[in-house]
């Protein structure tokens, strides 16, 4: 009996969490390794290269359910149309996101194209502005869900229909985002970068219930702010503190992190990374990574600190990213450097 009640409470908890996901955007703990999702002005902002390719994967709630929540992304961007006289260039990029909640009852697929312009301001600073234009599809299948009306005190009666009446099982909409970045690099040992962005500028309508236009079925704009920095302590060690804040309607999230990159090979071709992040009142996130030439792999694990740790044993989510950046022209024998200022060992 106690086991049945506990199971019922857990199902209700995850049902409430699923409802919360309906109104929240996809996110990664490794926000610094998902640049186009963090800010569209990051398109073409690529230190040490003129192109970048990356993949992210997040697996959440695997410790308490056989059907965890999975979030995946692929992205790529490059620098084009450089203007050496004006010290500016254009960045182009693309981003695809896919999220599957639980047994697949709620899925979200998004695709964005990004464009940004980057302008050097004197010798040691850079200003960037960018825009994302994308298309989003969200689908739901209520057959895999259990509802409170199906709970009879001992178990869920699957023969009782407790699902709400939906007008449609999917929602499609155009989505617009914009962002602004500023970078300051007074010398080859200090790099500071901060930016702000606004998502859902057009406030698209997302609803499975209502066909009419109303404030209640429109997405709230999401405001993001981030800060990255790197300090080269010597030819072997770089320390990178960072922070991230996001606000959407009444939901907010604050994160801080610090990473240490160690030049294991001496010439910068092999790096070892260790870091620690903290999501306010929610989780602590250790990170480990290794870099080989232009490729960096980073693994992180969300250790739950909130009240949910009673259900998941503090095992929140694991996440990894794979990012490659390089220079296209070096393969054509020209060796042109990236327009973006470099920061290396």
Predicted feature residues:
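DNA replication initiation on ssDNA origins
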Residues: 1
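Sec/Tat signal peptide C-region and signal peptidase I cleavage site
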Residues: 18-23
């Amino acid at each position: 009996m106690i086991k049945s009640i506990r199971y019922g409470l857990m199902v209700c908890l995850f049902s409430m969490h699923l409802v919360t996901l309906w109104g929240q955007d996809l996110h990664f703990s490794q926000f610094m390794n998902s640049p186009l999702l963090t800010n569209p002005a990051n398109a073409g902002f690529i230190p040490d290269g003129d192109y970048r390719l990356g993949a992210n994967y997040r697996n959440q709630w695997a410790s308490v359910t056989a059907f965890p929540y999975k979030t995946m992304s692929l992205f790529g961007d490059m620098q084009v149309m450089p203007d050496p006289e004006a010290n500016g260039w254009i960045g182009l990029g693309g981003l695809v996101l896919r999220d599957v909640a639980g047994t697949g009852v709620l899925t979200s697929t998004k695709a964005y194209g990004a464009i940004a312009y980057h302008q050097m301001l004197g010798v040691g600073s850079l200003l960037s502005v960018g825009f994302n234009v994308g298309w989003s599809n969200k689908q739901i299948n209520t057959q895999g869900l259990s509802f409170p009306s199906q709970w009879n005190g001992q178990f869920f009666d699957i023969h009782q229909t407790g699902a709400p009446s939906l007008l449609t099982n999917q929602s499609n909409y155009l989505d617009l985002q914009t962002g602004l970045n500023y970078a300051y690099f007074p010398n080859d040992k200090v790099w500071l970068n901060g930016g702000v962005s606004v998502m859902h500028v057009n406030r698209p309508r997302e609803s499975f219930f209502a066909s009419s236009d109303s404030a209640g079925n429109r997405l709230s704009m999401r405001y993001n702010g981030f800060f990255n920095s790197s300090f080269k302590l010597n030819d072997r060690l770089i320390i990178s503190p960072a922070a991230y804040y996001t606000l959407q309607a009444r939901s907010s999230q604050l994160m801080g992190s610090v990473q240490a990159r160690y030049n294991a090979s001496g010439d910068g071709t092999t790096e070892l990374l260790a870091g620690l992040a903290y999501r306010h009142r929610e989780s602590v996130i250790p990170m480990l990574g290794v870099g080989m030439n232009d490729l960096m792999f980073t693994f992180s694990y969300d250790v739950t600190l909130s009240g949910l740790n009673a259900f998941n044993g503090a095992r929140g989510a694991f996440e990894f990213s794979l990012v490659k950046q390089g220079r296209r022209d070096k393969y054509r024998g020209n060796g042109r450097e990236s327009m973006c200022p470099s920061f290396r060992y």
